[in-house]
From Swiss-Prot:
Gene symbol of the encoding locus: nop10
NCBIfam families: PRK13130.1
Known function: Involved in ribosome biogenesis; more specifically in 18S rRNA pseudouridylation and in cleavage of pre-rRNA.
GO molecular function terms noted in the UniProt entry: snoRNA binding
Family per similarity comment: Belongs to the NOP10 family.
The name this protein goes by in its record: Ribosome biogenesis protein Nop10
InterPro entries for the chain: H/ACA_rnp_Nop10, H/ACA_rnp_Nop10_sf, Nop10_arc-typ
Cellular component, GO, one term: ribonucleoprotein complex
Length: 60
C-alpha cells in the first residue's frame, strides 16, 4: 500500500506526494512540524504594535 503523506523537497521546497521531486529530481522527505511552545516569544511585540496602532488611530 502506498503511503499518502505530504513530502517536501529539501532542495527546492516543493510539496508533493511523490518520493522523488518532479521539479528537480531530489529525494523528498516528510517535513517535521515546527516546535510547539506555550510561551509566546513575540506576543510582547504584537501587543506593543497593537497599542501603537490604536493610539495612532485615536490621534487622527
Amino acid at each position: 500500500m502506498v503511503e499518502m503523506r505530504m513530502k517536501k523537497c529539501p532542495k527546492c521546497g516543493l510539496y508533493t506526494l511523490k518520493e522523488i521531486c518532479p521539479k528537480c529530481g531530489e529525494k523528498t522527505v516528510i517535513p517535521k512540524p515546527p516546535k510547539f511552545s506555550l510561551e509566546d516569544r513575540w506576543g510582547k511585540y504584537r501587543r506593543m504594535l497593537k497599542r501603537a496602532l490604536k493610539n495612532k488611530n485615536k490621534a487622527e
